[in-house]
């Protein structure tokens, strides 16, 4: 018996024993059979990445076989998703990526904390956070920083994350970057947000972009690439932060310089950020889940 068959048998037995009203799947290997299990529960699928980067199968591949496999795999996935009672995605932007589906519901990730204090936005410090990987685009951020650090030599850029920093250390040396600190991940990011005056997200793509919301909850305005998917749902451009065309490092540098040089605007955006981001507060998001559960159990359309 293969691993998939064994998993199906055990999951089916567990659901038959538990008899849940609702089963929520994170759409791993059970996506191929979850809706066929006869345990009586409503089936919800929840996706924590966006469609364009789901398992990286829909990237533009030069290999014809890979392209064909990606299309066939996505066609099969959509067929299974249609059978779910509800399919939950993290952003309105990603909802639009699934035009074949009529059962899509947007429920964003909740903020993991409520900040009782806020940054005064006086420190000359810019912060970014995430794994040291291609996805997070720190190479693009360093390129932008090369256009900022000499213009504002009293400002610092601190990046916090896990992973191999070698690529970024090489770029920092190549571009002779000043006041750049490639930090390790820290368990106390809340403190780092409070020490910051600007938060930057340089990701090429995201599932949502929770670090943006976290920084905003601390009263820190964010500058972010308008990458798929999440930042455009979180940041209200020009009100509580600034969006930049994805991958455009010149524009990223311009927007960061703008907030550095306009203290009053920076502080006004910070105040609005900590208010606007409360739509992602835990109690708000949990109420959306409760409403979804109740509607499914009551047979209410939504």
Could you say what each language-model-derived stretch is?
Residues 93, 110:
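Carbohydrate-associated surface elements
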Residues 236-238, 242-249, 257-264, 278:
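Conserved acidic donor-binding segment of nucleotide-sugar-dependent glycosyltransferases
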Residues 12-13, 51, 66-87:
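Membrane-proximal helix-turn-helix segments that form the acceptor-binding/catalytic region
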Residues 168-186:
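Nucleotide-activated donor-binding/catalytic signature segment of Leloir-type glycosyltransferases, i.e.
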Residues 25-30, 47:
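Short His-centered aromatic/hydrophobic patch
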């Amino acid at each position: 018996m293969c691993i998939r068959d064994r998993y199906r048998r055990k999951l089916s037995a567990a659901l038959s024993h538990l008899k849940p009203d609702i089963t929520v799947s994170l759409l791993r290997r059970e996506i191929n059979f979850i809706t066929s299990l006869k345990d009586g529960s409503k089936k919800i699928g929840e996706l924590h990445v966006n469609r364009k980067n789901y398992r990286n199968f829909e990237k533009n591949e030069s290999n014809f076989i890979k392209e064909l496999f990606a299309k066939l795999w996505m066609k099969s996935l959509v067929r299974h998703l249609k059978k779910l009672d509800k399919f939950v995605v993290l952003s309105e932007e990603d909802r639009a990526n699934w035009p074949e589906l009529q059962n899509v519901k947007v429920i964003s990730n909740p903020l993991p904390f409520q900040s009782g204090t806020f940054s005064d936005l006086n420190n000359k410090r810019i912060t970014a956070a995430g794994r040291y990987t291609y996805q997070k685009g720190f190479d693009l951020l360093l390129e932008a920083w090369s256009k900022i650090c000499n213009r504002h030599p009293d400002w610092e850029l601190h990046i916090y994350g896990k992973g191999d920093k070698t690529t970024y250390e090489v770029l920092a040396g190549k571009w002779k970057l000043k006041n750049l600190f490639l930090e390790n991940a820290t368990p106390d990011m809340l403190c780092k947000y409070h020490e910051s005056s600007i938060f930057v997200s340089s990701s090429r793509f995201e599932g949502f972009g929770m670090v943006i919301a976290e920084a905003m909850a601390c009263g820190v305005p964010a500058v972010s690439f308008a990458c798929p998917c999440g930042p455009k749902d979180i940041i209200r451009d020009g009100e509580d932060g600034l969006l930049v065309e994805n991958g455009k490092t010149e524009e990223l540098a311009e927007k960061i310089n703008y907030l550095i040089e306009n203290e009053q605007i920076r502080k006004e955006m910070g105040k609005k950020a900590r208010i606007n981001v409360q739509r992602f507060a835990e109690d708000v998001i949990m109420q959306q889940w409760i409403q979804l559960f109740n509607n499914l159990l009551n047979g209410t359309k939504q």
